[in-house]
Amino acid sequence: MAVFGVLILLSSFLLWKWGLTPNARTLVIPLLIVGLIPVIAGVSATISNNKRLIEYESMWNNDQQQFKLGEKARVEGFDEIFKYSYPAAILLTIGGAILFFLVGSPLWKSISLCMMVLGLMAYIIDHFAAERAIIYLEKINESLSDY
């Protein structure tokens, strides 16, 4: 995720440095904002995951069955997040597309393009996160049924 954000930030920098048209110039700040979101999210997720690994290891060593039950409850809670994130991603993407065709100014066209990028990025991330959650939950359930 952070790598994708860095690529967007690089695009923003390149447009700032060499973009000559009004549309290129107005994309700089919206792309900068859209690029910072996955960079910050990716870095903070990596830091928090590394901290949780130590905690998870000690929880696993203390009581494996309780750890699995806790993980099952945590992963099942992801469905609540996806109920809201999928529609938000779709609304951002479609809203950006509609806005792009309704407005004429380069700034609003740039904002609408960045809305579409943000929406697609959110949908792609959530799609793969949901897939991983399903696989993880299946493994947890298999492990719990072994006992």
Name the predicted role of every residue range.
Residues 1, 79-86:
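Short, amphipathic, aromatic/basic-enriched membrane-interface segments that mark the entry/exit
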Residues 1-39, 88-105:
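Long, highly hydrophobic alpha-helical transmembrane signal-anchor segments
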Residues 26-30, 84, 110-114:
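Alpha-helical transmembrane segments of integral membrane proteins
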Residues 41-44, 48, 121, 125:
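Hydrophobic alpha-helical membrane-associated segments
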Residues 43-62:
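Membrane-water interface of transmembrane alpha-helices
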Residues 60-82:
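Short membrane-interface loop/juxtamembrane segments of multi-pass integral membrane proteins
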Residues 108-145:
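Alpha-helical transmembrane segments and their immediate juxtamembrane interface regions
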